[in-house]
C-alpha cells in the first residue's frame, strides 16, 4: 500500500472516491432522492437569459447556481426565479432552502429574500468571502 499525490484530478479517481462515499452514505442515512430543479428565463428562440439550477433533497431546496444576464439585473428576474424555485420546492415537500454565494455576487439579494447567513468562509480563495445562507420555507 502507498499514498499517491496528484494534481491531475482525473475522472476515474474522482468517480472511484465518489462511488465509495455514496455507497457508505446510502448505507447510513434515511432514503431520499436528489431531484433536479431548474427555472429558466429564455428569449423567443429558447436562449437562456437567466436561470436557477439546483436540487431538492428531502426537506431541503439546495440552490447550486443562479444567474441573471447583466442587461436584465435589477428588473426582478432573479427574484422571480428564486420565488418559483421555492414554490416548487414547497410543493415537493421541502421545508428549508440553502444557498451559497461569493461576496462579489449576491449576498444582499439572498438577505433581501429572507435568507439568513449561517457561515462565512473568510479569505476565500485569498481575499474574498464565501457566504452560506439558509431559509425556512
Language-model region placement:
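A structural microfeature
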Residues: 49-50, 119
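Conserved N-terminal entry element of GNAT/NAT acetyltransferase domains
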Residues: 1-9
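Conserved GNAT acetyl-CoA-binding A-motif
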Residues: 89-102
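Conserved catalytic-core motifs of GNAT/GCN5-like acyltransferases
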Residues: 98-100, 116-132
Amino acid at each position: 500500500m502507498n499514498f499517491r499525490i496528484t494534481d491531475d484530478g482525473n475522472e476515474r479517481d474522482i468517480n472511484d472516491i465518489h462511488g465509495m462515499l455514496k455507497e457508505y452514505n446510502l448505507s447510513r442515512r434515511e432514503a431520499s432522492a436528489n431531484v433536479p430543479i431548474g427555472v429558466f428565463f429564455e428569449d423567443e428562440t429558447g436562449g437562456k437569459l437567466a436561470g436557477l439550477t439546483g436540487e431538492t433533497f428531502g426537506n431541503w431546496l439546495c440552490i447550486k447556481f443562479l444567474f441573471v444576464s447583466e442587461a436584465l439585473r435589477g428588473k426582478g428576474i432573479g427574484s422571480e426565479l428564486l420565488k418559483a424555485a421555492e414554490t416548487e420546492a414547497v410543493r415537493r415537500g421541502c421545508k428549508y432552502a440553502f444557498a451559497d454565494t461569493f461576496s462579489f455576487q449576491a449576498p444582499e439579494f439572498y438577505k433581501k429574500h429572507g435568507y439568513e447567513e449561517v457561515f462565512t468562509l473568510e479569505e476565500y480563495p485569498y481575499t474574498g468571502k464565501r457566504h452560506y445562507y439558509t431559509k425556512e420555507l
